[in-house]
Amino acid sequence: ETLLHTQIYQLRPEANIVLHTHSLAQTLMSMRYEQDGKIEFTGYELQKAFVGIKSHDGTVSLPIVANSQNMNVLCESVQALFAQDNFWGYLIAGHGIYTWGRDMIEARRHLDAFEFLLQAELAKLSYKL
C-alpha cells in the first residue's frame, strides 16, 4: 500500500500528510456504493470541514475505486480520480479510506469529517431515512 501513499504525494503536492484507516462504516458504505463510484454528502454542516467548502448547500463527493491485489491496477484506478479538482479522499471498496492534508490537523479533520458523514449515511440507511 506504500505505492498509494506515495502516489498521493506526487499528485497532490500540497499534501504533506496521508492517512489511511479501516472502519466498519468505510467498509460497508464503500461496498454499498461501489457501483455508483462515489458517495455524495449534501446538506451537512460538517461539509465545511473540507478545505475550500464554505457552505452546507453543496455536495461533497467521496470517490470509490474497486479493490485489487495488483497495486499497479489499483494505482491506475486511483490516478484517474485525480483529474477532479475538489476531493479530499477516496475509498477502496471493502477496504478503507485514504485522505490527506497540508498538515496533520487538516488531514485528521478530513478523516474525522468523512468518518462522521459515512456513519451518518449508514445510520440513515438502517433507519430508512
What are these regions (language model features)?
Residues E1-L129:
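Glycine-rich flexible loops
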